């Protein structure tokens, strides 16, 4: 199984590069599926390897492909002066571009327990969480409750409001990035609550997924972003 996974990832990488090269020749900015810094099965038992592989290779790849296609169509429409098509493409760009942005953050927000996943945040982020939410447990409880309450599909976020210099918890619908809730918001931790993120393992019990995902949250990465942006 592991050999097949590696082979499929290499094949996928080759297809991504070929597609990107063709679009670059035409002078169009393109985006590619980022590699994961861990194996698909590395987050088990919190998130199954099957979910991670499908989520990454199928769902995220689809957002990247559709985003690039929409940008290519936008380029053509702008060159033709086709204003109606330019306007029509905005929803596809927002949805698929947002899907690419959000998932690129999500993969970094996760880490195997052997590499620090689930370890509590330290330093200034840990102190800020205690100040704003009382404790890490208080933050986890709040984010899990708000994530479980999302109607349909979306995301739950821990963000930094750079203008107000404070941490915030918010949700976004569908694939809207956190920045759509405010230009000064920087995502620190984003948790995908679309069914494709958990259904194969947790069925329709989203709260159980939200309970276990914290066991593989990469607080080290969140702390690095916080340190960089909170200045």
Curated annotation (Swiss-Prot):
Homotetramer. Residues 1-29 form a transit peptide. Its cofactor is Mn(2+). Destroys superoxide anion radicals which are normally produced within the cells and which are toxic to biological systems. One of its GO terms (biological process) is response to zinc ion. The keyword Cell cycle does not apply. The gene is MSD1. The modification Phosphoserine is found at residue 124. Keywords: Manganese, Metal-binding, Mitochondrion, Oxidoreductase, Phosphoprotein, Transit peptide. Binds 1 Mn(2+) ion per subunit. One of its GO terms (cellular component) is mitochondrial matrix. This is Superoxide dismutase [Mn] 1, mitochondrial. Its main location: mitochondrion.
